[in-house]
Amino acid sequence: MSSFTHFNEQGRAKMVDITHKEDTVRVAVAQTSVTVSREIYEKMTSNAIEKGDVLAVAQVAGVMAAKKTADLIPMCHPLMLKGVDIAFAWENDGEAHKLVITATVKTKGSTGVEMEALTAASVCALTVYDMCKALDKGMVIGPTYLVEKTGGKSGHYRRKTD
């Protein structure tokens, strides 16, 4: 079990010691989507959802989620984030209306921010679902994935596109 860094000698979970790692600028970009009905799309784009401005609330929820990642994911280190940005884009194809959510998280530190970016994107999507579920519970979230990460010993990663 010694090849897994999140396990101690007894095979129990531990938080990895990162004191020896060099501080570098770290950036992670994660993406997810929410596919919604035409009714939800029309109401969201005209800001007519009863609970309020869905994208504004989701954006704040995503930033908050990035900052709280270490409270949600047991082995994540609490990080001093330097920036969190949430972007939204619609992809419409006939009757399919997909809200693409992109979360970009930055820090300067000794561990990456991939989990923070993934958490931010996921909580944005969950917030959209929560605010729109009264209209249609058939919304589909995902897929959720890491698009890119830079910094650290493992270097640059960019997801291969389909």
Swiss-Prot record:
Keywords: Lyase, Molybdenum cofactor biosynthesis. It is an enzyme of class 4 (lyase). Substrate binds at residues 75-77, 115-116. The active site is at residue 130. Pathway: Cofactor biosynthesis; molybdopterin biosynthesis. One of its GO terms (molecular function) is cyclic pyranopterin monophosphate synthase activity. It comes from the Bacteria. GO terms for biological process: Mo-molybdopterin cofactor biosynthetic process. Its EC number is 4.6.1.17. It catalyses: (8S)-3',8-cyclo-7,8-dihydroguanosine 5'-triphosphate = cyclic pyranopterin phosphate + diphosphate. NCBIfam families: moaC, PRK09364.1. HAMAP family: MoaC_B (MF_01224_B). Belongs to the MoaC family. Catalyzes the conversion of (8S)-3',8-cyclo-7,8-dihydroguanosine 5'-triphosphate to cyclic pyranopterin monophosphate (cPMP). This is Cyclic pyranopterin monophosphate synthase. It comes from Geobacillus kaustophilus (strain HTA426). The lineage of its organism: Bacteria, Bacillati, Bacillota, Bacilli, Bacillales.
